[in-house]
């Protein structure tokens, strides 16, 4: 594409008072811009009309908007997709954070424009990846309440849906549920659940195809091109689908492990699931002797919130126990009912059910249960630490003890997947994702056959950065396999996952990325002639987007890709690039920075800022009128994981005095939009020492800092402290070479 460049400089919003537009026009002239205009109201209708006229009459096809942050006015500065657009941030990151009229302020603006022009020249319009055999079908795995709801809602939205259930009948956990907690005012009365009605609705929906007594034998391919093998009654069927909802639910925690609660010592110590089955079957009797239950005690958090068992709260157990206590009070208001609890977590309107049970005479005892024993007369007594009195107490004798066991996601069942060991000499890897071979999806992915799980085995992702997401593009867990939740939440979760699946097939079929770079039409391209089969890209991709062939060559799957560029940062041969983002592009942007010689005493600091948290924080610092060191030159990157170490070498060779990597927080409470890009960058920094030793430079010249988007008020001190440290080291000895 032969480029004809138009540069449009805004002098409004204080930019013109802070920076000389004529000096910026001169920079545009240095880069052979065919058109250069300055306007006090560049986002106004008249100015936009002039830009469009230049496109039509002057043949401008590459546009630089030197004005406000690229994070704003995206709908205003929106040009045809065959035009290349570059936004240069003169407002938030120059005019609003630097003193007006200063030489350093102008030099910062000039470098920002130079870098923008280089990026523009290196960019090409993205060509979306679109295949002829894309599918928009939705596969739902799991035929319980969540799965049936997801399938029904997706079909009602007009999408063909395939539902796979391992049992012969649909329903999952709710097949054995007697009644449900209240969801309507006055939130005191339990509600009936008609599974047959939901099943009938599903059966009558023409867009739903149901496989029962079946399992997913394998899933290969990528979003809109998932090839699914479904095994049923010894036969195998093939389906091509666009996205997958995983709704395989959870199972109760194994009560046999609860020896401290005497499970297994008496048949009258049962689980909440056992009691639900009793009520469903209409036969609620003591297992020991078949007599009616005259009194009952519930022990909450049986295994949950316990570091020896399930460290987390299972969310629904409290309300389930309140519901079951209500069963007894409805049958006979005189039945003694005890509930032993740590905390009653009856959120929202469930609090009204809790209050109703207090009115019904249920006795609540707050404290940890220390023992359940036979009283010698064929009944049970519970010993507990009473939080209110600080003393141990013993309950009245009861006929039945119900343990409210927690929930374990089906994704947490199975043996750990063994990750291939890194090649000898490879850098220390970031901790691998925890994947268990649970036989839910059987993915044909290089990084493992199932969704990666978080700390407790739930295949969720960061709840702020990735709502409803997983670490595998196009696969959305829902219901209790995603997180602990109750029936009502599971139904809502099913609809959310169905909507995400629909969003995915629509975006991918148009050649666009999904969250977080939603709408991006670029994708990584591989120059295979230089590939050394080092496996760095296949191992480090956070989303499992790259498989390998038998010779360890990377096999990219463009529709799995989230466009983070982590593979680009990983590649030592620099064979991976995007149409609008490449190693050479950023390297040339660094090389275009004007670096004064050492006698001018104007050091230059390169800031590689993650576009997701760090760059917005820099914007917010400017919006808040906070000033920081004028030696800083900011280049936004898709993710710190996309930073290739050659950029560090380029910057130091250029004479840049210090390099600062500003990215998202990593670790257990990570905030990286690409999961572990920031962590990967931190790991790669271990190689920087080797580079600096080779260049005979101090290691303090390169630093990485983690910031949240809310840390904008800390930005000035962070940058000023770094500038002070670099200044104390003296000029980069490569300056001027």
Q: What kind of region is each of these model predictions?
A:
Residues 610:
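Active-site core of glycosidic bond-cleaving carbohydrate-active enzymes
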Residues 1-603, 615, 627-640, 657-660, ...:
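Residues forming the flavin
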Residues 621-623:
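Short, surface-exposed acidic-centric catalytic microdomains
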Residues 365-367, 707-737:
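C-terminal functional segments of enzyme domains
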Residues 642-653:
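Thiamine diphosphate
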